[in-house]
From Swiss-Prot:
Belongs to the frog skin active peptide (FSAP) family. Ranatuerin subfamily. Disulfide bonds join 28-33. The keyword Isomerase does not apply. It is found in: Secreted. The lineage of its organism: Eukaryota, Metazoa, Chordata, Craniata, Vertebrata. One of its GO terms (cellular component) is extracellular region. Its main location: secreted. GO terms for biological process: defense response to fungus; defense response to Gram-negative bacterium; killing of cells of another organism. This is Ranatuerin-2SPa.
Length: 35
């Protein structure tokens, strides 16, 4: 139903956000956090 779709959308957004943060910290480890 609609509620399940909303939960899926939110989960997708959260997953994207978490993946982005993980990617950033990974980059940070590799490059030595140079901005």
């Amino acid at each position: 139903g609609l509620f399940l779709n909303t939960v899926k959308d939110v989960a997708k957004d959260v997953a994207k956000d978490v993946a982005g943060k993980l990617l950033e910290s990974l980059k940070c480890k590799i490059t030595g956090c140079k901005s």
